[in-house]
């Protein structure tokens, strides 16, 4: 296949980490990658805002912070205003009113070279969409661990 590329692929991620209200050892995500000659970082930012407004049925506060991921340059982390507490601060957002929902960035030139593409000709946009956190925000769930619990009273809400 030749560029341009547009991929969206789902997956379940397993991590060896301590669990808390925002972190679980296993979670679901979508990864999206666009590689094209004219796809800009600004286009990616518009795409992110569009995804979030579709998921939540309205515009939500969004901010982008610099972040490091070895396969993108520059890298960023996308935060949205915490909908569990309305941005006032809670255990989900660590009392700051924001929660990270998507890391991403522009594919690193070495990634493009490894795909047989000239990084001077092609650019792109990568984002990792954490579904569990988006569902937390959409339904006001204050603990991600509940999704993997055996509590049928909680789980039956989502039939």
Task: Report each predicted region and the residues it spans.
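TRNA-recognition modules of translation machinery and tRNA-sensing kinases, especially anticodon-binding
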Residues: 1-159
């Amino acid at each position: 296949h030749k560029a341009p590329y547009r991929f969206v692929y789902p997956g379940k991620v397993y991590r060896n980490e301590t669990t808390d209200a925002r972190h679980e050892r296993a979670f679901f995500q979508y990864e999206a990658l666009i590689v094209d000659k004219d796809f800009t970082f600004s286009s990616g930012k518009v795409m992110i805002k569009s995804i979030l407004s579709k998921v939540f049925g309205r515009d939500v506060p969004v901010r982008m912070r610099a972040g490091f991921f070895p396969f993108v340059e520059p890298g960023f982390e996308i935060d949205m205003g915490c909908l569990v507490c309305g941005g006032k601060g809670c255990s989900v957002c660590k009392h700051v009113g924001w929660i990270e929902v998507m890391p991403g960035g522009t594919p690193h030139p070495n990634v493009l070279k490894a795909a047989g593409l000239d990084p001077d000709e092609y650019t792109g946009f990568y984002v990792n969409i954490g579904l569990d956190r988006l569902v937390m925000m959409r339904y006001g769930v204050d603990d991600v661990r509940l999704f993997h619990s055996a509590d049928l009273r909680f789980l039956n809400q989502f039939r």
